[in-house]
Regions:
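Eukaryotic tandem repeat interaction scaffolds
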Residues: 77-79, 83-160
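Blade-level signature of beta-propeller repeat domains, shared across WD40, Kelch, NHL, RCC1
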Residues: 193-226
Length: 226
């Protein structure tokens, strides 16, 4: 158990490291086995300098890139630059996406290689990580309007799932149009109240839900989401 300089919002594990984003404008990086602190992306000072981010909300790794969604941009850092005791430089930042607090989520469609990212402005932004080049601010390759405010998303065998506010709180969504295909707010005997962050691993949906008495995490077999 550790304390951060701001409220933690996103976490991921990849290649024996744990990455935690928080509103203190940093992404903390730990050794996954010893939990020893290694370094951080962002120096804790709000800004857009070469070693800065603004409030960090989510983090994802894909093909050697660490991707961090902060309050304004998606920041890209080379994974090979992550070294203990060294603050890595931002490789490149996306175009300005609008300065908004909220819950953000990112996932890569392995079939197309596109990065999908939620935004509180009722939209899902698309990027092409394979085309990232140093010194060139990547622009969105697409944008999907969404019925509700999306919080998080993930793919499972080509199917896109999105958590959000509104009546349809957890849905399967068409990855090309953003249209809701099926509402899974009720899964078996579980009715989600206020789901937010989730991931799908080992054929299982792990999803946080804010319920009356606090927050719980469900583990639901994907076979239940037909």
């Amino acid at each position: 158990t550790g304390k951060f300089g701001g409220r933690p919002n996103g976490v991921t594990r990849a290649n024996d490291k744990i990455y935690v984003t928080h509103e203190g404008s940093r992404t903390e990086i730990f050794d996954a086995k010893s939990h020893q602190f290694l370094t951080c992306i962002g120096n804790g000072s709000w800004g857009t300098g070469p070693t800065q981010t603004v409030h960090a909300f989510d983090v994802l790794l894909y093909k050697g890139l660490v991707m961090i969604h902060d309050k304004r941009y998606v920041n890209f850092v080379e994974e090979q630059a992550i070294q203990s005791g060294v603050t890595p430089r931002i490789y490149v930042r996306s175009e300005h996406l609008g300065e908004t607090n909220g819950t953000y989520g990112m996932a890569v469609d392995e079939q197309t290689g596109l990065l999908y990212s939620t935004h509180p402005a009722k939209r899902i932004d698309l990027f092409a990580p394979d085309g990232i080049r140093e010194g060139v601010s990547p622009k969105r390759t697409g944008q999907l309007a969404y019925k509700n405010v999306p919080y998080d998303l993930d793919f499972y065998e080509g199917r896109l799932f999105v958590s959000s506010d509104g009546t349809e709180k957890f849905c399967e969504v068409n990855p090309r149009t953003g249209e809701i295909m099926k509402d899974h707010t009720t899964i078996g005997g579980i009715t989600l109240q206020a789901p937010e962050k989730f991931c799908i691993r080992r054929h299982t949906l792990f999803i946080t839900d804010r319920v009356k008495n606090g927050t719980c995490v469900y583990a639901i077999p994907m076979s239940e989401l037909k």
